[in-house]
Amino acid sequence: MKKPAVILATAVLGSAAFAQQEIMTTTFNFDSDTPGQPPKGFEFGLTGKGKPGKWIVQAVDDAPSGKNVLVQTDGDTTDYRFPIAYTGPELKDLRLSVKCKPVAGKGDQGCGIVWRLKDANNYYITRANALEDNVHLYHTVNGRRVKFAGWNGKVASGVWHELAMEMVGNHIQVFFDGKKVIDDHDDTFKDAGKFGVWTKADSIIQFDDLTATRK
């Protein structure tokens, strides 16, 4: 049933682009994408060194929704290596969440989300690490990642988690499995940008239900 014209619609998409003037919330669940191929509507980049990352859709038995997930499958062990997959539209104030499952990685098992992204070297990032048992919040400026807030707590490998953030103005809140774990402020990036997902070094991570809501 159609909503009145003044109400912004909510959409659930495989990986398609969407009209920002009509949609307030969207979820990418990757179920309309072809397994073994990159998801439609996404761009890919690399912060740091090493291989750029290989992002493909996979069908898995335990996907949080549907059957498909997005996976970064290249286990290059370069330490300062951050593959990212991102999409639009550009948003400034938003809530961003993702379901993520750390699958493998001897050096890292980092599952992250990025927002207010200008390019592969400039964005906000929060990530949960199953090898370190923590959640950190950073800004990355000209390729240099700087942590300014964090939380220590159990991040289990091999199970699905939800990582989420909300940012309005310079106020940032980060949530892990429904619990607020970080509440801070930062003025590094003040304009709208794209959003997406992130990994580190040899992390093999599955992602599903990437959801962005304009605030």
Predicted features along the sequence, with ranges:
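Ligand-recognition surfaces built from glycine- and aromatic
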Residues: 22-25, 189-215
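Extracellular carbohydrate-recognition regions
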Residues: 20-48, 208
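Secretory/extracellular carbohydrate-interaction modules
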Residues: 35, 72-136, 140
